Every structure is written in structure tokens, then in C-alpha cells.
């Protein structure tokens, strides 16, 4: 009897809720989510010993180009987990989780060691200050700092650099059609980027004509500026920049002394009939006077954002690194954005958009891929104004261009790009790394759901007087609940990769990687740089002189000066025929 009672007592104590563990059971009836195994991690990610001292001395440089998404090993003896596939990577983390110290610094070091060209958005200036010297002195990089916070301490970033370069080649060799075609291509890319920064043509509606015509007109003015106003003995300083484009459009919009003709119409009439600048402006040139004025006003409104005395120190001087140099040589660009002045944030989107489109053009000339992998580290991507970034995601990956947008919340993407745009960006990121969320974060709930569910053991225990019982069943459980995501320790992250199970990983503080900083990289003060502007009069004087037959055939009514420019006053001595005074072209309209 005592044995029976003891046995029942033991059974009653054995059936406890604490003994029911949420271990994976069944055959995936409620979900099959799980973590990657060590074997799968080894097969998916390249394991590269992180040897900073050797790399900086030029020894044992890594050959695998890619992104560091984790590490293994002890301090100072770490092995980096590198994803070397053609990918985009979305990083999500709240402020203060160490996105720069744990993620960016190791990746910048590895990018330099593996020879990738890269651009880094830098909201505080720390990246440029700490890594400019290392990239230049230790790894032999071309370094450019575009500082929108202190433009007088910035390198130049002339948006017309490539247009000017190929137009100079064309001017020296008029038969070089390839150079002229490249100049026209880069001019069209820049015009489209400025007139249509968000890339959404669907919202134009009935105004589509004005925007399309504005793109053509802007392309036309850029080409004329690049071709006919190069530096010369009288004007040795470069005048071909975006601010001069604004000034020319404004001057050409003014009415001339020829009734019913603007300076723009007279200027276009002076060009040879087969000149491409005349063709690009055809939509505006052949429209009604009021419509043409609206087109030119649209161009001015788009260019108005560049009118800033400080920004001129950046925009009006030649770029230290252009797209072709960026793609073919080891180059690093630091784009410093002022957190306290969001009015200049549009420049970041414009520069990234224009650079990426130029890189696409370079890749297309090299068999559809860039010679060297290019990475754009877009820190604070969520605080930037929206721009036409979707083609960069969809077309950049196959061309060896990797984008790394770093955001604080998925809500930032939805706010800037809408629900559909946010989903497109997320779907085009083959890697997602996240960790460290605010207590009330909704992003943690979304990502918990994205990790999926697994089938776990569940059950209940009931105790009667003489018959304790236990019931077991299967149920679903998130791989990580939102609460568990919010409590992830600093430096720990979750990595999701397309076609793979998620990975729990750890990124160490940059000091534990063996990363040390050298002397700060400082761009010298350039407060004494005077800006030179183009003007309509010089442009008219430098236009090619047309033949008499061309002058007689021109539809625009005006007289032609002996130097090839446009004479807006009637000629001094009107011709007479048969005793009757002949009118000069355009005089009948006065």
C-alpha cells in the first residue's frame, strides 16, 4: 500500500507545467522556421580572418569582396562572415545601437582591404574624419569629401564634369562621335535627375508635356554651355557648372528687342539645323509663347534649389572623383550631411541618383557589369527626402553595385516611399540585418512575423485526488517574439538572407576588431575661391558662324553679327534695291 501511494505521489509531482518545454516537435504542422546551422553558415558566408595590421601594410589582402554580417572568434583574432554575393543589404536599428561602431567601421576597413570603391553618407562627419586618412595613406585610395555642413572645407562636385570632359574631346576631334554621344548621354541623365527627382511619371497628368519639354530644354542648355564656353585666355576659370545653367536659362527667358522673339528662340535659330542642342529643345521651341515660358519657368524652379552661396563652393568646382574614376580606381567618397539643416539633404539624393545612373552607363559599356564592386553605405537613409531610388535597387545588383540603406524604422521607408515603395525596397534587399529596438517599436512586430513560426510542444497538467494527468499538443510559436527582439543585447543582430534560414550573429565593437584611427582627415579651408559664371553674351559670341544660306533660311527673324553672334539692333545701313529700301530680317515685325 505504501509503495502504491508513493508511486502516485511521484507521478503527481512528475506531471508539472515546468516539465513541458517549448522544444521543436512534429513535422512542421504549424511552421518550419529555424536557425541556420554552423554547416549552413559556413557554406553561405565566406570566413575571412580579420587582420588589420597586415592589411594596412599591404600583406594578405582579402580577395572576397562583399559585406561583413557577423564574426566569430576572440577579440583581436576575429574571423569575419562575409556575404560575397551580388546583393543589397537593409540594416534596421534604433538610435544608439552601434550601427557605426559595430557595423560601418568594420565594413569600411574590409572595403578598403578588398579594393572596393564606396560612398558613405556621413551625418556627423566622423567617418570622413576617422577613415579618410586610413583609406588614402594605408590603402592608396582616391578620397573625396563633399561637406554640405562646411562647404568651404569641401572638395568640388561639379555635376557637369563628365559632360564637360567628353565635350572637350569632341571639340578637339569633331569626328569623335563616341565622345559626343557620351556627352549627350550624361547631359540627359543629369537633366532627368534634376527635373524628375522622384522618378514618378504617373503624377504628371496633363503637365507631362511641360516636364518632358523641360528635360529636353535643360539638356540643350547643358550641351551648349559645355560645348561653347570652355575656359580660354579671357576666361581661364571654369564656368561650366549647374549655377551657370540657371543663369543662362534666366537670361534666355528675357524678351529680346525683336518683337515676339525671346533670346532663347534667337539663340536656337543661330545653331546649325542638325545640332542636337536645337533638337533637344524642339518641344519648347515649337510651342506657343506662353507654353515655352512655362517650360523655362519649370526648369528655373528645379534649378532654384542650387542657388546657395555656400553650395557654390561645392557645385562650381570640378569633381575630385567622377563616376568613371569611381568605377575603375579605388575611390572613397564621404558625403557629409548636416543634421541640423535638412534643406541640403536633397543634395544627397541628387548626387546618389546621378552617380548611380552614370555608373549604370559605365557598366553597360563594360558588358553590363562594373570592373570593380561599388558599395553605397547610406546611413540615415530614412531621413533623406525621397528620390528615384527604386531603379538603383532593381538594376544595380546585377551590375555589381551594392546599396546598404541604414534606417531606424520601417515606418521611415513607408513615410518617404509609400507602402508599395517600401515593400519594393524591402523585397529587393537580399540581406536584412537588424537588432536593438525601442520598447514601443512596431518594427519589431513586423520582423518577428517575417522570421516565421516553428512547431513547438505545448500541453496542460490536471491533478485529481487520485489520478493526475498530462495532456500534450503541438502549437505554433514565433522564432523570436517581439519582446525577445526588443531585448537583444547590444552588438547582437539577426541576419536574414534570401534562400537561407535566418542567422543569429554578433558584431564586435571596432576596437575588438583591431581597428585604430590615425590622424584626422581634414580638408583645407577654401574661403578665397571666386566663382565664375557664364552669360548669354559670351555664349552668343562663341556660337559657330552660319553660312549666308543658313542665315537667309532661318525662321527666327534677326540680324547676324560679323563675329558669329546675334545682333539684336537693326544693321546700320539697310540695303536698297531699285531705289527702294530693303528691310532687315525682323524689321518688318518692329
Task: Place the predicted regions along the sequence by residue.
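Basic- and hydrophobic-enriched, low-structure N-terminal and domain-boundary segments
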Residues: 1-97, 101-109, 114, 152, ...
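Short intrinsically disordered, low-complexity coil segments enriched in acidic
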Residues: 2-8, 443-450, 500-503
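General helical secondary-structure elements
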Residues: 30, 49, 473, 502-504, ...
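A short glycine-/small-residue-rich loop at the edge of a beta-strand within enzyme catalytic domains
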Residues: 46, 56, 346, 380-383, ...
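P-loop NTPase motor domains
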Residues: 68, 72-76, 80-401, 416, ...
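Conserved ATP-driven motor cores of ASCE-family P-loop NTPases powering translocation/secretion/packaging/pilus
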Residues: 393-395, 399-494, 585
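Short, surface-exposed polybasic-aromatic patches that bind anionic ligands, especially phosphate groups
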Residues: 508
Amino acid at each position: 500500500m505504501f509503495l502504491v501511494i508513493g508511486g502516485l505521489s511521484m507521478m503527481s509531482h512528475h506531471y508539472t507545467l515546468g516539465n513541458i518545454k517549448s522544444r521543436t516537435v512534429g513535422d512542421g504542422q504549424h511552421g518550419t522556421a529555424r536557425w541556420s546551422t554552423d554547416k549552413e553558415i559556413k557554406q553561405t558566408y565566406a570566413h575571412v580572418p580579420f587582420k588589420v595590421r597586415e592589411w594596412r601594410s599591404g600583406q594578405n589582402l582579402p580577395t572576397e569582396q562583399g559585406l561583413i554580417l557577423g564574426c566569430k572568434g576572440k577579440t583581436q583574432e576575429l574571423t569575419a562572415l562575409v556575404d560575397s554575393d551580388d546583393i543589397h543589404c537593409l540594416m534596421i536599428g534604433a538610435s544608439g545601437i552601434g550601427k557605426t561602431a559595430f557595423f560601418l567601421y568594420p565594413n569600411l576597413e574590409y572595403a578598403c582591404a578588398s579594393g572596393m570603391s564606396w560612398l558613405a553618407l556621413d551625418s556627423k562627419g566622423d567617418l570622413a574624419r576617422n577613415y579618410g586618412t586610413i583609406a588614402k595613406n594605408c590603402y592608396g585610395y582616391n578620397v573625396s569629401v563633399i561637406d554640405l555642413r562646411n562647404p568651404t572645407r569641401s572638395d568640388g562636385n561639379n555635376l557637369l564634369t563628365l559632360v564637360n570632359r567628353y565635350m572637350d574631346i569632341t571639340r578637339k576631334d569633331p569626328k569623335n562621335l563616341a565622345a559626343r554621344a557620351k556627352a549627350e548621354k550624361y547631359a540627359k541623365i543629369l537633366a532627368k535627375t534634376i527635373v524628375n527627382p522622384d522618378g514618378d511619371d504617373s503624377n504628371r497628368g496633363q503637365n507631362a508635356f511641360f516636364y518632358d519639354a523641360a528635360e529636353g530644354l535643360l539638356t540643350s542648355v547643358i550641351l551648349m554651355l559645355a560645348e561653347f564656353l570652355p575656359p580660354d585666355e579671357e576666361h581661364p576659370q571654369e564656368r561650366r557648372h549647374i549655377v551657370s545653367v540657371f543663369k543662362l536659362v534666366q537670361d534666355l527667358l528675357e524678351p529680346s528687342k525683336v518683337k515676339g522673339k525671346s533670346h532663347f528662340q534667337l539663340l536656337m535659330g543661330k545653331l546649325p539645323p542638325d545640332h542636337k542642342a536645337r533638337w533637344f529643345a524642339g518641344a519648347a521651341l515649337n510651342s506657343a509663347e506662353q507654353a515655352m515660358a512655362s517650360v523655362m519657368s519649370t526648369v528655373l524652379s528645379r534649378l532654384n534649389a542650387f542657388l546657395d552661396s555656400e553650395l557654390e563652393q561645392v557645385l562650381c568646382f570640378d569633381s575630385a572623383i567622377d563616376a568613371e574614376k569611381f568605377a575603375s580606381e579605388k575611390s572613397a567618397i564621404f558625403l557629409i550631411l548636416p543634421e541640423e539643416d535638412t534643406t541640403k539633404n536633397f543634395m544627397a539624393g541628387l548626387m546618389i541618383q546621378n552617380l548611380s545612373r552614370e555608373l549604370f552607363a559605365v557598366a553597360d559599356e563594360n558588358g553590363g557589369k562594373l570592373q570593380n564592386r561599388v558599395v553605397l553605405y547610406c546611413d540615415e537613409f530614412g531621413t533623406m527626402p525621397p528620390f528615384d531610388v527604386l531603379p538603383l535597387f532593381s538594376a544595380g545588383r546585377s551590375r555589381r553595385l551594392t546599396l546598404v540603406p541604414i534606417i531606424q524604422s520601417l515606418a521611415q521607408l513607408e513615410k518617404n516611399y509609400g507602402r508599395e515603395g517600401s515593400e519594393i525596397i524591402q523585397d529587393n534587399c537580399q540581406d536584412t540585418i537588424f537588432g536593438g529596438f525601442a520598447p514601443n517599436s512596431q518594427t519589431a512586430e513586423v520582423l518577428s512575423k517575417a522570421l516565421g513560426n516553428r512547431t513547438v510542444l505545448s500541453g496542460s497538467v490536471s491533478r485529481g485526488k487520485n489520478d493526475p494527468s498530462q495532456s500534450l499538443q503541438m502549437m505554433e510559436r514565433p522564432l523570436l517574439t517581439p519582446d525577445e527582439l526588443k531585448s537583444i543585447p547590444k552588438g547582437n543582430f539577426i541576419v536574414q538572407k534570401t534562400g537561407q534560414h535566418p542567422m543569429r550573429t554578433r558584431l564586435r565593437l571596432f576596437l575588438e576588431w583591431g581597428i585604430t584611427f590615425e590622424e584626422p582627415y581634414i580638408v583645407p579651408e577654401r574661403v578665397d575661391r571666386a566663382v565664375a559664371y557664364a552669360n548669354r553674351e559670351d555664349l552668343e559670341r562663341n556660337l559657330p558662324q552660319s553660312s549666308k544660306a543658313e542665315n537667309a533660311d532661318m525662321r527666327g527673324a534677326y540680324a547676324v553679327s560679323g563675329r558669329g553672334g546675334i545682333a539684336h539692333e537693326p544693321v546700320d545701313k539697310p540695303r536698297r534695291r531699285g531705289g527702294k529700301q530693303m528691310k532687315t530680317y525682323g524689321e518688318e515685325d518692329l
